[in-house]
C-alpha cells in the first residue's frame, strides 16, 4: 500500500489559486430605509443617511420619490406617482440618481409627463441622453445681449413689446383673457421658419401645461396639429389631477429638454402655462413638509423657485454656439391685480410683460393687450428696422387715444384735433385686432401699421377697417410684390418702398367698396362746360320785306 503524502507547498499553491480566481458575485452593500409617515403625496423616510438632495428614492412597487428635506435621521420626500399603495413600514431604497429628464430630437411632436415618459400612445421615445433638472444657469460671461427678433406674428406684441431670442417675456392677466392663445400663436408663427430648413431660423418649441384640464391640453395639441406646428413642438403635461410633485417639476423638465437644444447651438422657445399653479403646488409641498410659511403662506424660497427656472433662458455667446432659449412664462392674476406676491416676483425676474386686461377682452379687443402696462425691456434692439420705424408712432398714438378716451367720457366738448386723434385711435385699436391662429408675417405687419399711423385709414369707417386691411395687404402682394420683398431682404422701409405704398393705397382706395355698397372714394362729377369756351355757329336769318298792304 502506497503512503499518501501531501506537501505543504501543494496546499499553499491550491489556496493561492482559489483566492486569486474567486469572484464575489453576490456580495454588495445597499442602504435601506423605511417609511415612517405617508399621506397627501408626501412620505417621511428614516434611514438612508447618504441620500443626496434631489435624489430619486424607490418605494414599494417601483414608485419614485424626490428627496427634498434632508433632516437629522429623517428625509422628507415628494411622491412622483400614485401614493395609495405606499404604507408605513415599507422599505425604501436609494437609486443613486439625481432627478433628470431624457432629452433629444425624438421628443419633437410628442406629449410626455414630467419624468419624460410618453403619454400620447405613440410608442417609446429614443433619447439622445439625459439632463439633470437642477443645473446652474448660464453665467454672465456665457451670454450675449439679446438682439435677434423672435416674431410672434401678433401685431400688438411685435410692434410695441418686441421679443428677442433669449428674452423672458411674461404674459400676465386674469383667467379667460387669452393668455394661452397668445402663447400658442407664437408657437404657430414659427412654422415658416421650420419649413425653411435653415437651422439659423428654425425654433424648436416646448409647451409646459401645469395644472391644466386634460380637455384643455387636448385642445392645445389639436390646435398645434391642425396648424402644422406639432412637428417642432414638445408638450410636457402635468394635468390638474396629477400629484403636486409633478406640477412642481414639470417646468424644470421642459426647460431641460429645451436647454439641450440651446447648448447644441440651436434656438428654442418654451411656454410655461402657468407658473401660478406651480407656485401653488410648491406651497402645498412645503407646508406638508413643515417648512416655515411666509407671505400668503408661500415658503421663503418661492422667489428662487422661479428665478432659477427663468434664468435658464439666455442667448449664449458665440463661443458656446450662439444658441438661444426664449421663455414665455404665464401668470394668472385675480381682478387684474398685478401687485400680488407671485406676479410682482415674476415681473421683477423677466425682461418685460404683456398685460392682458379683462375689460378690453369683454369689449371685443382680441388680443386684449393693455399697451400702457405692457413693456419690453429689450426694446427696439430686438426689432427689424422697418418695424422700429413705424412702431414708435403707434405706441404714442395709442397712449394719447387712451388718455383722450378717458377724458371724453365726461362729455366735454373737444376741439377738432382731439376728435381727429380719437378717430385715428379707434382705427388703430381695430387694426391691432387679430383672430386666433392667424399670425401675421412681419412684412405684412409693417405695411398694416404704416397705413394706420400715417393716416391712410382715417377716411375708412371703423367697421370696415379689418376688411380693408386684409384686402389691401393681398392687393399689395399681387400688384406691388416688390414692397414685401424689399422689407424682407433689407429689413428697412426705404423711401422707394414708401413711394410704392403711397401709390398702392391711392390705387386700392379707388376700387374698395364699403360694407353698405358705396365706394370709398367717390369719383368727382363732371363739371359743366364754360359757355365762353364753346364755339357756336351763327346762322343768318333772312326775313321777307313787309308788304304795303300790311302797312296799311
UniProtKB/Swiss-Prot annotation:
Broad enzyme group: translocase
Annotated organism of origin: Frankia casuarinae (strain DSM 45818 / CECT 9043 / HFP020203 / CcI3)
CDD domains: ATP-synt_F1_alpha_C, ATP-synt_F1_alpha_N, F1-ATPase_alpha_CD
Keywords from the UniProt entry: ATP synthesis, ATP-binding, Cell membrane, CF(1), Hydrogen ion transport, Ion transport, Membrane, Nucleotide-binding, Translocase, Transport
Family: Belongs to the ATPase alpha/beta chains family.
Function, as annotated: Produces ATP from ADP in the presence of a proton gradient across the membrane. The alpha chain is a regulatory subunit.
Reaction catalysed by this enzyme: ATP + H2O + 4 H(+)(in) = ADP + phosphate + 5 H(+)(out)
The protein's name: ATP synthase subunit alpha
Compartment annotation: Cell membrane
Region (Disordered), start-end ranges: 516-552
Family matches, as Gene3D superfamilies: 2.40.30.20, ATP synthase alpha/beta chain, C-terminal domain, P-loop containing nucleotide triphosphate hydrolases
SUBUNIT field: F-type ATPases have 2 components, CF(1) - the catalytic core - and CF(0) - the membrane proton channel. CF(1) has five subunits: alpha(3), beta(3), gamma(1), delta(1), epsilon(1). CF(0) has three main subunits: a(1), b(2) and c(9-12). The alpha and beta chains form an alternating ring which encloses part of the gamma chain. CF(1) is attached to CF(0) by a central stalk formed by the gamma and epsilon chains, while a peripheral stalk is formed by the delta and b chains.
Bilayer topology annotation: Peripheral membrane protein
GO CC annotations on file: plasma membrane; proton-transporting ATP synthase complex
GO MF annotations, alphabetized: ADP binding; ATP binding; proton-transporting ATP synthase activity, rotational mechanism
Site (Required for activity): 374
InterPro entries documented for this protein: ATP_synth_asu-like_sf, ATP_synth_asu_C, ATP_synth_asu_C_sf, ATP_synth_F1_a_nt-bd_dom, ATP_synth_F1_asu, ATPase_a/bsu_AS, ATPase_F1/V1/A1_a/bsu_N, ATPase_F1/V1/A1_a/bsu_N_sf
EC number(s) reported in the record: 7.1.2.2
List of residues binding ATP: 173-180
Amino acid at each position: 500500500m502506497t503512503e499518501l503524502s501531501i506537501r505543504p507547498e501543494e496546499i499553499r499553491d491550491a489556496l493561492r489559486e482559489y483566492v486569486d480566481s474567486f469572484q464575489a458575485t453576490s456580495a454588495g452593500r445597499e442602504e435601506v430605509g423605511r417609511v415612517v409617515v405617508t399621506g397627501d403625496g408626501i412620505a417621511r423616510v428614516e434611514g438612508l443617511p447618504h441620500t443626496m438632495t434631489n435624489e430619486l428614492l424607490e418605494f414599494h412597487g417601483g414608485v419614485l420619490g424626490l428627496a427634498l428635506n434632508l433632516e437629522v435621521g429623517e428625509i422628507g420626500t415628494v411622491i412622483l406617482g400614485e401614493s395609495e399603495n405606499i404604507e408605513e413600514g415599507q422599505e425604501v431604497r436609494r437609486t443613486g440618481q439625481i432627478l433628470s429628464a431624457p432629452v433629444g430630437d425624438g421628443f419633437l411632436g410628442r406629449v410626455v409627463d414630467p419624468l419624460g415618459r410618453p403619454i400620447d400612445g405613440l410608442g417609446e421615445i429614443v433619447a439622445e441622453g439625459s439632463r439633470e433638472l437642477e443645473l446652474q444657469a448660464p453665467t454672465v460671461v456665457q451670454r450675449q445681449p439679446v438682439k435677434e427678433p423672435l416674431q410672434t406674428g401678433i401685431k400688438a406684441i411685435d410692434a410695441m413689446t418686441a421679443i428677442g431670442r433669449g428674452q423672458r417675456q411674461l404674459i400676465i392677466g386674469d383667467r379667460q383673457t387669452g393668455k394661452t392663445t397668445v402663447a400658442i400663436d407664437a408657437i404657430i408663427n414659427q412654422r415658416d421658419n421650420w419649413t425653411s430648413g435653415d437651422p439659423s431660423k428654425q425654433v424648436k418649441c416646448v409647451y409646459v401645461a401645469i395644472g391644466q384640464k386634460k380637455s384643455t391640453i387636448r385642445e392645445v395639441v389639436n390646435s398645434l396639429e391642425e396648424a402644422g406646428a406639432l412637428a417642432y413642438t414638445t408638450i410636457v403635461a402635468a394635468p390638474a389631477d396629477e400629484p403636486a410633485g409633478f406640477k412642481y417639476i414639470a417646468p424644470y423638465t421642459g426647460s431641460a429638454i429645451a436647454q439641450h437644444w440651446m447648448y447644441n447651438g440651436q434656438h428654442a422657445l418654451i411656454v410655461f402655462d402657468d407658473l401660478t399653479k406651480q407656485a401653488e403646488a410648491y406651497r402645498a409641498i412645503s407646508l406638508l413638509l413643515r417648512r416655515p410659511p411666509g407671505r400668503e403662506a408661500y415658503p421663503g424660497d418661492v422667489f428662487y423657485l422661479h428665478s432659477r427656472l427663468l434664468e435658464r433662458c439666455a442667448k449664449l455667446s458665440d463661443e458656446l454656439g450662439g444658441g438661444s432659449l426664449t421663455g414665455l412664462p404665464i401668470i394668472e392674476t385675480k381682478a387684474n391685480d398685478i401687485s400680488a406676491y407671485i406676479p410682482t416676483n415674476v415681473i421683477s425676474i423677466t425682461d418685460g410683460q404683456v398685460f392682458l386686461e379683462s375689460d378690453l377682452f369683454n369689449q371685443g379687443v382680441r388680443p386684449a393687450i393693455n399697451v400702457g402696462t405692457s413693456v419690453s425691456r429689450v426694446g427696439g434692439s430686438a426689432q427689424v428696422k422697418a418695424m422700429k420705424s413705424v412702431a414708435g408712432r403707434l405706441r404714442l398714438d395709442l397712449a394719447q387715444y387712451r388718455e383722450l378716451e378717458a377724458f371724453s367720457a365726461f362729455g366735454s366738448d373737444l376741439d377738432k384735433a382731439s376728435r381727429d386723434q380719437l378717430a385715428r385711435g379707434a382705427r388703430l385699436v381695430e387694426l391691432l385686432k387679430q383672430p386666433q391662429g392667424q399670425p401675421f408675417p412681419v412684412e405684412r405687419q409693417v405695411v398694416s401699421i404704416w397705413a394706420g399711423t400715417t393716416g391712410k385709414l382715417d377716411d375708412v369707417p371703423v367697421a370696415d377697417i379689418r376688411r380693408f386691411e386684409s384686402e389691401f395687404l393681398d392687393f399689395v402682394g399681387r400688384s406691388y410684390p416688390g414692397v414685401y420683398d424689399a422689407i424682407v431682404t433689407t429689413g428697412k422701409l426705404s423711401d422707394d418702398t414708401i413711394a410704392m405704398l403711397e401709390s398702392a393705397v391711392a390705387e386700392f382706395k379707388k376700387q374698395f367698396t364699403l360694407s353698405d355698397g358705396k365706394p370709398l372714394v367717390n369719383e368727382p362729377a363732371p363739371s359743366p362746360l364754360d359757355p365762353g369756351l364753346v364755339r357756336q355757329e351763327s346762322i343768318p336769318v333772312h326775313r321777307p320785306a313787309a308788304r304795303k298792304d300790311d302797312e296799311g
